[in-house]
Amino acid sequence: MSREITARPNKNVPIVVGVCVVAFFVLLAFMQQKHKTHSGGDYGVPTFSNGGKYRDGTRSADFNSNNHRAYGCGGSGGSVSSRVGQQLVVLAIVSVLIVSLLQRLRSPPEHICNGACG
């Protein structure tokens, strides 16, 4: 009568996947490129991300404003807390999908009795 020992399912895979997903969203949150706030270009004066005026004793510049919702100025949903909330919701959805997928893929270990099981 031969006996086979089945391998235990690897319980570290969901933990590793979860840590990778969290690290990815943290990377996205902190690595967003910022717009340029100062320039040494033609004017040699600070530039403004959404328009504005600059005036000192020798120079003045008027930068045209872009869209009123640009860079979260005056638009809803542009604050940091709302972006973090949205990222947490997406993180939760992705985590649930990954966990459910891993549970579906994990099959119960096969028990081979070779006719000796009672």
UniProtKB/Swiss-Prot annotation:
It is found in: Host cell junction, Host plasmodesma; Host endoplasmic reticulum membrane. Residues 1-11, 103-118 are cytoplasmic. GO terms for cellular component: host cell endoplasmic reticulum membrane; host cell plasmodesma; membrane. One of its GO terms (biological process) is transport of virus in host, cell to cell. Interacts with movement protein TGB3. Belongs to the virgaviridae/benyvirus TGB2 movement protein family. This is Movement protein TGB2.
